[in-house]
């Protein structure tokens, strides 16, 4: 799966995140992660942390 800037993704933890930086395609990204308590945490995620890309529009 190809991940692009600002894609919304579902993480394997069940959280959603927006990609804000691509460090290396298919390897690592910086993401704004929507936490269960309503906060947003910016963190580095691996491609293997991503369950699927969420399509916002066609």
Question: Where would I find each of the regions flagged by the language model?
Answer:
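Basic/aromatic-rich interaction segments and small domains that mediate binding to polyanionic partners
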Residues: 2-51, 56-57
């Amino acid at each position: 799966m190809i991940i692009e800037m600002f894609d919304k993704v579902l993480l394997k933890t069940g959280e959603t995140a927006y990609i804000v930086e691509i460090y290396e395609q298919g390897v690592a990204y910086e993401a704004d992660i929507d936490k269960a308590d309503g906060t947003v945490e910016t963190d580095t995620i691996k491609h293997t942390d991503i369950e699927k890309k969420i399509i916002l529009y066609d």
